[in-house]
Amino acid sequence: MNKLITIERHFLEQQKSHPEATGELTDLLNDVAFAAKLVRREVVRAGLADILGMAGTTNVQGEEVKKLDLFANEKIINAIGEHGRFALMGSEENEGTIIPPNNDTGRYILLFDPLDGSSNIDVNVSVGTIFSIYRLTGDDPKEADINDCLQKGSEQVAAGYVIYGSSVMMVYTTGQGVHGFTYDPTIGEFLLSHENITTPERGKYYSINEGSLHQFNDSTVNFINYLKEDDEATGRPYSTRYIGSLVADFHRNLMTGGVFVYPATKGHPNGKLRLMYEANPLAFICEQAGGRATNGKERILDINPTELHQRTPLYIGSKEDVLKAEEFEKEG
């Protein structure tokens, strides 16, 4: 683009188009962008800074924690929490909610996955940060509790992700379209590079771990087989593209068209991805870009959460592809 627009300037211009805006959400998003810069700085030099490998602990999910997971989690909590703009925070790495300092004026809730796909970081595969912002449901920030976090995804006021790859991009929505910013390390700024992102109605790729095919139910297997069949009218067969890093797989399909599938399995009948930290924010972005997201039977953004670390199956991507997946799930 000829006109260089920083992410801060973009947020301000968006704010001006809403006379009722107080500027609080603009400040929150700027805080998130700043935290992303801190995480990016360490991700790109992880092999030199002795923060690769395992930390020797497990998180609330029962998963081994990487050193970089802990670093990213700590940086985001410290960079964002100290400004007093959030009444409460929740991280995939923390069992309970996080009460930020100076939260007595916070009017928002932040939920985030500090480093999605971190199991790939040791082999230099793209990883990402995912975030979701809600309004406080009550009037007193000091009385904020877990119930303020357990809102439907349709109540999100903003969501986004940062992908740390060959370049670093931040993609976000506030319900007014989806915009992407690429980090320019020479000036230390995120610059608008992808305005009003839309995803194709039908894609040509599917992303799923077919190594777990024996764990899938028949309807999921039938859907995958359908995508592999020859049919010129619907652009089949589809090609497989699976990285194993949710942000990277989702981002590629968002830009090129396709469907990401992480279904229920025999080992995880309720799914494995986290509703609040992964599925909800990506579903908000996907729908704003013209796509669709479901658990196979219900729209992701309509699910009533009952737990902070609740899991869900996920079918997300191009609208026609997800609708077809739902057809197979309903038949099954």
From Swiss-Prot:
Q: Does the keyword Zinc apply?
A: no
A GO CC term attached to the entry: cytosol
Where Mg(2+) 2 binds, per the record, is at: 113, 116, 278
On cofactor binding, the record's note says: Binds 2 magnesium ions per subunit.
The EC designation for this entry is: 3.1.3.11
Q: Which reaction does it catalyse?
A: beta-D-fructose 1,6-bisphosphate + H2O = beta-D-fructose 6-phosphate + phosphate
Pfam families cross-referenced by the UniProt entry: FBPase, FBPase_C
What organism is the protein native to?
Prosthecochloris aestuarii (strain DSM 271 / SK 413)
Where is it chiefly localized? cytoplasm
Q: How does it assemble?
A: Homotetramer.
Give the UniProt family note. Answer: Belongs to the FBPase class 1 family.
> What is the name of this protein?
Fructose-1,6-bisphosphatase class 1
Residues annotated for Mg(2+) 1 binding in this entry: 92, 113, 115
| HAMAP family assigned | FBPase_class1 (MF_01855)
Q: Could you provide one GO biological process annotation from this protein's UniProt record?
A: sucrose biosynthetic process
Instruction: Report which gene this protein is encoded by.
Output: fbp
The record's keywords, sorted A to Z, are: Calvin cycle, Carbohydrate metabolism, Cytoplasm, Hydrolase, Magnesium, Metal-binding
**Top-tier EC class:** hydrolase
Entry annotated with the keyword Lyase: no
**PANTHER family linked:** FRUCTOSE-1,6-BISPHOSPHATASE-RELATED (PTHR11556), SEDOHEPTULOSE-1,7-BISPHOSPHATASE, CHLOROPLASTIC (PTHR11556:SF35)
- Pathway listed for it? Carbohydrate biosynthesis; Calvin cycle
Subcellular location, record wording:
Cytoplasm
